[in-house]
Amino acid sequence: MKTAIITDSTASIKEGEIQDVYVLPLQVIINGQDTYRDGKDIDYDRVYQLLKEHPQGLNISTSLPRQADLIELIEAIKDKYDRFVFLPLSKGLSGTYDMIVQAVKPLSTPKKEFVVLETSDIAISLKWLVQEVKALTDTNCPTKAIAEVVDQHKQSIFTAVTVKNLVQLRKGGRISGLKKIIATLLRVKPIIFFDKGVNTLSGKAFTFVQALEKIFTFVKSKFGDNFKIKRIGFCNAFTPVKAKEVKALILDFLHTNKITLQREIESSFITSAIIAHTGIDAFSISLLLDKNK
């Protein structure tokens, strides 16, 4: 059985980067009228520059992938594969999952299986999930077992995003718990926890180190003392120099607090669809945890 995996452009995967993995672009909309496909018609550098030129906020939003792009992709690859596994970003952030389900539901046959799995994920940790599922499909793993692995992954991931301000997040409507504490966040770094597939404004910090302390305090409260970090990801919307400085702070924090890693920190690019909501000078830490160690 040959399997295609289809994810979307928020997964930090470039087209052609992983064999048999295909990327469906979300849409980026500027000024309510100019529409671009994430990673195809517009990229991170262009959106970064636009955000930099509009420090008070840019009228930019995102939308579902075009259904026409989905159908075109399926038509292009349908004869090459027997099974199609879709791993879109969290349905708590986007209607992409529901759109794909409606589009491919009529296509499944005994000879062509179409499977859409809810990931509760985004960005580099969604890429990790794609890599894990790819390894399974390479061994002809049954669909039921793949779905179980996806469910286990959802229970083992956590992402925290620290942003410069809430300008773009407010414009994009991608965050809850905002009204009660917005007035207190004028001069601090808001911290957003992405947990169970949704964003929640969970704290604030004056420094990057303080943000890290809050992040790992939450991880400990959620997962307990007996866990190990299997993978850690660092995504950012900084200049290269600042990105290097913040990554060094993260490493120093982990070392000082005797938090051991099974791998080095993995850095990944942010897509235009994500920076449209975070704004510039934001970073995220994604963790894949082994809770049983």
From Swiss-Prot:
Hexadecanoate binds at T62, S94. Residues 3-289 form the DegV domain. Keywords: Lipid-binding. The keyword ATP-binding does not apply. GO terms for molecular function: lipid binding. PANTHER family: DEGV DOMAIN-CONTAINING PROTEIN DR_1986-RELATED (PTHR33434), FATTY ACID-BINDING PROTEIN TM_1468 (PTHR33434:SF2). May bind long-chain fatty acids, such as palmitate, and may play a role in lipid transport or fatty acid metabolism. This is DegV domain-containing protein MG326 homolog. It comes from Mycoplasma pneumoniae (strain ATCC 29342 / M129 / Subtype 1).
